[in-house]
């Protein structure tokens, strides 16, 4: 068994629509073609062992099935003018509820920073960060994600 303590982290996700490098924040909206939700699954027990040894966390964050992306919605630049609300229910209980206005870096700043180090390519996804409420999952749990009140996904952990 790879991990006995996997946690969910709901995040806003933006899909890149054209190739870009060294993108200024003021132009970032021109590189986004859609947005939606994603779940970043983390093996906390694996992460703790790696942290103790001062090692990188990629084994805890980048394993098979460690990311899920919802249906994506068309993006318009005006969406960045106001906070984007998103939430996650686990087994019908609200566990995460947040909005883009609570993020330390907004999506334009994220794109500017990431594009300094990596060429962004058409189809790349940028996960933005997670609101409070991260927690463990178990086989059979049902996760439902909503964006601006619209349900974008429902998945059962297997």
What are these regions (language model features)?
Residues 1-121, 125, 133-158:
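Catalytic-core "active-site belt" of small-molecule-metabolizing enzymes
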